[in-house]
Amino acid sequence: MRYHMTLITFDERNQVFHLSNKTISYIIGLEKATYLSHLYFGKAIKRYHNSRKYPLIDRSFSPNPAGLPLKTRDFSLDVIPQEMPSHGHGDFRNPAVQIKQVNGSSITDFVYDSYEIIAGKPALKRLPATYVESDSEAETLVITLVDRLLDLTLKLSYTIFADRQVIARNSFLENKGQESVIIKKIASASLDLVSQDLELISLAGRHNKEREIERQTVQRGTRIIDSKRGSSSHQANPFIALVSSKTDEFTGTAIGLTLVYSGNHEMLVERDQFEQTRVMAGINPFGFEWELAPSQ
């Protein structure tokens, strides 16, 4: 059984979301009916045949998530390409969301709950954002994740436009529990890529010399481009691109990330032990704490 709309489909049998227009496709998988995985982002494809699943291999020091009744060691969040990684269940890379509880714990386990496909692009309350003038111009996929122990709901929004090579994303966290939590970090978007041949383009600068193009090979470890000035600033533009080594101004593969609304922001790129690259963009966690009370 397949649920069809013009730009977004859900393959119930293979548990795959496919966002696609005439030029691009963005594909999300559901692993073990529990965790979101990133499968593909690139040129448009007509149909996904479940051929890009990440290989399940027993990797030393990459543990199974505690909440799954697995009999083998071939599934670990430490290696699976994810959409919105959190902390405390076997993924030792940088998390996209980090919550502090009243008891001091920062462990969260956001698992899949449901999805909704919406015509158009819902507005963001009190925030500037991309928009459409007609619902026929775009469609939006909203995936709901839940942490059942903390009773937190995390909604991930993905908008694909009919005639743009763009996926617009945002994150919405709601506390349905009985105790307040402190948001230490929450990214607007996170993306894991298995490509090994990547370079990072960023736009540094200073007064009267803005947007100087810097390009460097993505090495193992973490590279952060951020602003702590209270604004996006000309010192650290809230834009980066991951490109292949052969990409130039006219041809080649490129994935760009930019924040539409930014004050103190962080653009993070991490290459792990398996040569995979995690990239995320959002509010700078430096000096950031937000108390999320019950029902907020």
Model-derived regions: residue spans:
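Short, Lys/Arg-enriched N-terminal segments with co-localized hydrophobic residues
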Residues: M1-H4
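Polysaccharide-binding surfaces and accessory modules of carbohydrate-active proteins
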Residues: F10, Q15-H18, K22, Y26, ...
